[in-house]
């Protein structure tokens, strides 16, 4: 009984498997028949063509794969790892491309702006006259007359609307002309009216080109006159040295100021030249000579110094002077005389006495006559009523400028500006 049972079971399983296989084959045959029905008019019915057609005719939903559920980033990484370029991923930019992109963008924008500007410029110049006529036509007669009076133009008589419009239009075009090319668009009547208004003689039978030449000649002359006016205004501006106190000094003071800085200058030079040279060399230091420190001393300090160091029967045993400047000159000659005779130790002591003394003597050592003399030589006003304190306060800025040049803050500003301009020139030349 048992072998028979096993045989029946095997036959039953074989029958079930055969039925399933027949079902699958029937399904494939039906799909092939359906697809074949769609391609019954195909030019070729070879096996390969039918297989390709059947494969292409399958529904995409039934072909599904694991990649359908992947996110975009995972798909891009998968393609990149396998050396496949993804159409959705932009190419990687190199550093040069990264920095070049803004420049390319700016260049494109600049080109667009230039083309737009040229287009609008041509359009505006072409329609300028139409626009002016349209604007002026909207004005009343009183507004046209007020515009002419305000801009210093003569109002035509009897002052009809046509005359007012023509006069205002001519005046506006005359003010708006910046290049002579715009004259070519004017009519003969407009050119003749403008030339007649400017009192320019027009030859009989003049052509349109002749009128344009006359108008250009007039505007060239007017342009030169305006440039001359600008030049005259510029020339009328105060000279730069007027900001410094040197413009008050006498010619002798200016010459001494330059010579103590080794600037060659003639005593016959005009005052304008002396002022320009003094202003140009205001920051030039004085020559480092020991006797130059005597220029700021009073007569009392000068005499004390000479009597103290007058040795060996010097020719300056009896010093006679009529002014402080003569005494300074005598003291400098004394220094030059002893410099060639004294020993190095004596000269060192003499120089120490010069450098240890203040550059400007104290107020108490100056006499009233000396203060007045110095103020007059520097072109400064003498206080009235006279006061030694006020006179010395007015004298100090001149003495310090004469000995040291401009103030410290002015020096810093000057050298800062000079250094900045030098760096700019060096940068321009390096381009």
From Swiss-Prot:
Signal peptide: 1-21
Pfam families, alphabetized: Ish1
Any single GO BP term: cell division
Superkingdom assignment: Eukaryota
Key word Cell division present: yes
Matches recorded under InterPro entries: Ish1/Msc1-like
Keyword Cell inner membrane: no
GO annotation, cellular component aspect: mitotic nuclear bridge stalk; nuclear inner membrane
Location in the cell: Nucleus inner membrane
Keywords: Cell cycle, Cell division, Membrane, Mitosis, Nucleus, Signal
Functional description taken from the UniProt entry: Inner nuclear envelope protein involved in nuclear fission, which is achieved via local disassembly of nuclear pores within the narrow bridge that links segregating daughter nuclei. Les1 restricts the process of local nuclear envelope breakdown to the bridge midzone to prevent the leakage of material from daughter nuclei during mitosis.
Protein name in the entry: Nuclear bridge Ish domain protein les1
């Amino acid at each position: 009984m048992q072998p028979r049972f096993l045989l029946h079971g095997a036959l039953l399983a074989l029958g079930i498997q055969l039925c399933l296989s027949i079902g699958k084959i029937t399904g494939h045959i039906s799909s092939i028949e359906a697809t074949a029905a769609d391609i019954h008019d195909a030019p070729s019915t070879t096996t390969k063509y039918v297989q390709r057609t059947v494969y292409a005719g399958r529904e995409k939903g039934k072909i599904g794969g694991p990649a359908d559920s992947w996110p975009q980033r995972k798909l891009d990484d998968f393609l990149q790892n396998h050396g496949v370029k993804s159409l959705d991923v932009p190419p990687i930019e190199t550093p040069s491309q990264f920095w070049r992109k803004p420049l390319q963008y700016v260049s494109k924008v600049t080109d667009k702006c230039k083309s737009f500007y040229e287009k609008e410029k041509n359009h505006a110049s072409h329609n300028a006259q139409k626009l002016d006529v349209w604007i002026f036509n909207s004005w009343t007669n009183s507004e046209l007359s007020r515009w002419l009076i305000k801009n210093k133009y003569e109002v035509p008589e009897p002052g009809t609307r046509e005359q007012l419009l023509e006069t205002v239009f001519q005046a506006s075009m005359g003010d708006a002309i910046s290049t002579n090319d715009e004259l070519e668009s004017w009519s003969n009547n407009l050119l003749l009216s403008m030339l007649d208004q400017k009192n320019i003689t027009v030859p009989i039978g003049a052509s349109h080109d002749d009128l344009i030449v006359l108008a250009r000649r007039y505007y060239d002359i007017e342009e030169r006159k305006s440039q001359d006016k600008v030049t005259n205004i510029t020339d009328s501006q105060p000279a730069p040295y007027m900001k410094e106190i040197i413009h008050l000094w006498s010619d002798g003071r200016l010459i001494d100021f330059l010579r103590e800085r080794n600037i060659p200058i003639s005593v016959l030079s005009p005052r304008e030249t002396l002022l320009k040279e003094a202003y140009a060399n205001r920051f030039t230091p004085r020559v480092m000579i020991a006797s130059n420190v005597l220029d700021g001393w009073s007569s009392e300090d000068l005499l004390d110094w000479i009597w103290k160091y007058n040795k060996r029967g010097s020719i300056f045993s009896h010093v006679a002077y009529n002014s402080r400047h003569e005494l300074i000159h005598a003291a400098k000659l004394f220094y030059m005389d002893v410099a060639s005779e004294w020993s190095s130790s004596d000269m060192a002591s003499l120089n120490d006495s010069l450098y240890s003394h203040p550059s400007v003597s104290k107020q108490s050592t100056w006499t009233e006559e000396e203060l007045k003399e110095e103020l007059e030589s520097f072109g400064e006003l003498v206080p009235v009523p006279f006061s030694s304190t006020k006179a010395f306060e007015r004298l100090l800025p001149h003495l310090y400028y004469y000995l040291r040049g401009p103030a410290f803050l002015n020096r810093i500003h000057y050298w800062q500006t000079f250094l900045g301009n030098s760096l700019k020139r060096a940068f321009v030349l390096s381009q």
